[in-house]
Amino acid sequence: MPSYAGADAPAAGQATGLLIIGASQSGVQLAGSLRALGFDEHITLLGDEDHRPYQRPALSKEWLQGKVGNESLIFRTNDYWVDHNVTLVKNERIEDIQRDADNPGAGVAIGRSGATYPYRRLALTVGASPRRLDVQGGTLPGVVYLRNADDALHLKELVPEATDVIVVGGGFIGLEAAASLHEMGKNVTVLEHGPKLIGRAVGDQTSEYFLKAHRERGLDVRLETQIDEILPDDNGNVKAVRLTDGEEISAQIVLIGIGVIPNTQLAETLGLEVDNGIVVDAHAIASDGTTIVAGDVANMPNPVPGSPADERIRLESVNNAIEHAKVAAYSLMGRSEEYAGIPWFWSNQGDIKLQIAGLSTGYDQTVVRHDTEHGKFSVLYYRDGQIIAADCANAPLDFMAVRQALSKSKNIDANGAADVSTMLKTLIA
């Protein structure tokens, strides 16, 4: 059954001014931005977890290792929601939405509990769900995913009794968790189906850097490796993974991080255009012209200035969740603000902090800055002589310089950047 926090809900039968489905980073930001812009109607923020809205990045790192507690993850206090006239609905999943025939922007959302939520405007900040691994034994106790707080708690409860952990997937989540678990004393094997680590997000040089770094720190990282079956012990718990070549690797935990699938079910119910997410315009408005969509679930025009008009992208990052929600708030206020900016990302993998500025798609030149003395590594990406992105490992000054150059539509001379002793900020022109 749903539970409630924050401000009082509207009286039975009365509509909330805005129903935000998805108590995510974007959902929280959207509510806060609307209040900052002067939106004075009641807001309902609805999520399907039995928790107050919280930050997810630490789940695979500091929280898993016990370095931070639950309260440090919570976005806002209950008093904040009361003061901002926002009702939190927890532990509720919307299963259907019926539009108002006379006002397409309004309607009624129907929850799994049977409760109804009338609204005058609707926003979807529903994020994405883990892609499932379809193999024999994939549902055994000890097979876990890591997308939300309950997933993280399940993993944390399993860790003390485990010696060997297999992480399936060499992306951000998999490598963050693998590094954390290794630091907790576990024998960790990373199995990546593709030919390189973090293949969707970084270039070859950065991928090679992380492969070498994780192996040097004690992780067993295997590329182009596929699982045939997850094997149970006599009690039905995970005991090993069998690879397609027949090798068996011992494990008491199998953590799967092979990407996510955008949650488009409600959009499909509403008849919205869907294509690798919910299709929106530059103002975070869906194809019906009324529904607002923000965050990981949104397939949007590429926000990088100068991108081709027909180029679209779906971004999964805290930065995008926040900035896209701000644009969505403007749209709800009737102000025409386009989403434009330089995407940036980060990933903490043990003692390595990766920061990415820009999008490297279409690069034709790279400059590698490897300061082995100070443990810093950066790859700068250029297209037609113009810097377009950078991957920076333990090199925050490089990251900040590239972000500054990109945000001001300036360049960083490639020849000068090749000298690691030169501060990149001095080359911005």
Language model segments and positions:
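FAD-binding core/adjacent interface of flavoenzyme oxidoreductases
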Residues: M1-I21, I74-I166, R242-T244, L255-G257, ...
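Mid-to-C-terminal Rossmann-like scaffold of FAD/NAD(P)H-dependent oxidoreductases
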Residues: P2-G17, A23, A36, V297-D398
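Beta1-alpha1 glycine-rich phosphate/pyrophosphate-binding loop at the start
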Residues: S3-T87, S180-A201, A401
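C-terminal catalytic lobe of FAD-dependent flavoproteins
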Residues: G17, K239, I249-E273, I352-A429
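Cofactor-binding loop segments of dinucleotide-utilizing enzymes, especially the Rossmann-like FAD-
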Residues: A23, L46-D48, N148, G170, ...
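Residue-level detector of alpha-helix initiation sites
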Residues: S24-V28, D50, A128-P130, D150, ...
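A Rossmann-like FAD-binding core segment of flavoenzymes
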Residues: D40, V82-G111, Y117, M184-V280
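FAD-site-proximal beta/loop scaffold in flavoenzymes
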Residues: T139-P160, N237, R242, G246-V327
